[in-house]
Amino acid sequence: MNYRRFGRTGWMVSELGYGMWGLASWTGSSDAESRQSLQRAVDLGCNFFDTAWHYGSGHSEQLLGELVRRNPGRKLYLATKIPPKNFAWPARPEFSLDDCFPPEHIEQYVRASVVNLGLESVDLIQFHSWSDTWLEDDRWVKKINDLRQQGLFQAVGISINRWEPRNGTRAVMSGLIDSVQVMYNVFDQNPEDELFPACTAQDVGVIARCPLDQGSLTGTLTLASKWPEGDWRNKHFNRATLKASVERANALKALVPPGMTLAQMALRFILNSPIVSTTIPGMRKVKNVEENLQIAGQGPLPGDLYRELRKHRWDRQAAR
C-alpha cells in the first residue's frame, strides 16, 4: 500500500481508502460480511475509513468502531459526517445555515457520532452537504472550533455536492477547512478546473469519492440492471441515466489493458492525480476489497492510456 499526505494535517493515509456507505444503507448488506471486508482491508494496509451518521442512522459508525477495537495496535484514520438538519441532499442555494447546520445540531451529531464509534475522539468530522453561502455565517466556525478544542475531533472537512466542485472553492480558500470530499473519477474530472488548484494552494486534503461512479465504472451494469424496491439506485439510475452510464462505460472497455479490470483502471486513473490524498471505493465483499486494493503500489497509468481516458470527461449537472 502507498500512503499519501492528507494535506496540512500531516497524516499519512492509504491512497486507497474505504467508503462505508454501502455497509448499512444498501439493500443486501450483511454485518458479518461487512466485518470480514473491513478487516481484510486493514490486513492489506488500508488505514482510512469514511463513514457518516446517515449511513444506517449510525450503524456504519458502530461497525467502524468495532473495527478499531479489533485492531488496537494499528492507527486507523476515521472520518465521519454530520447530516444536514433538514436531511436534504444536495444543499440548495436557498438553504440557510439554520436549515442545515445550526450550532446546536452540529454539536448534537458530533457527539452522537463519537458515541456510535465508542471512542473519545474522531480524526475527521465533515459536513455531509455544503454551500459556500454559509461562509457568511460564522456560527458554524465558532461551534466547530469549540468542539475541536474539547478534543472531540482533530480536523474538519466538507463533502461537496454532486457535480458542483466549484461550490466549495471559497471554503477551501478561506483557510477554515482541512479537507474536501468530492466526486472525482474518469467521468467527473471537473474538480481539476478550480477546486484542486485551491486545495494545492491551501494544503487541503482531498478525498475522491464515487471513484467507480456509483457502480457504472465497474462495467457490470447493463440496460436491464434493476435493484430491489427501496434501493436508492433505482432513483439514481433512471432510464436516461442508466443508458448514458452503460454506453460510456462500454466505450472504456476496449481501453482496459490485459490483466486489469475496468474498475482497477478507473481507480488508477484517480491515483494519477498527486493532489488526491485518498479515494474511497465502496467494498461490501472481500473479493471487491482484494480486487481494488490489488492496484496499491502499481504506480500511475501509462501516459498514453491516461491521456486517452481524459477524453472521456462527462460534465453533468444535478437536477434541482
For every predicted segment, state its role.
Residues 1-76:
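N-terminal binding-site loop/beta-alpha segment at the start of enzyme catalytic domains
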Residues 6, 18, 34, 49, ...:
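Conserved, mostly hydrophobic/aromatic
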Residues 29-41, 100-117, 162-171:
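Short, acidic/polar
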Residues 34, 60, 106, 110, ...:
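Aromatic/hydrophobic pocket-lining residues that form the small-molecule binding cavity
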Residues 57, 129-320:
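Beta/alpha (TIM)-barrel catalytic core signal, keyed to glycine-rich beta->alpha loops juxtaposed to Asp/Glu
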Residues 74-87:
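A short, structured active-site edge motif that brings together acidic residues
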Residues 86-100:
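Surface-exposed, active-site-proximal loop segments in enzymatic domains
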Residues 114-133:
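Active-site groove signature of glycoside hydrolases
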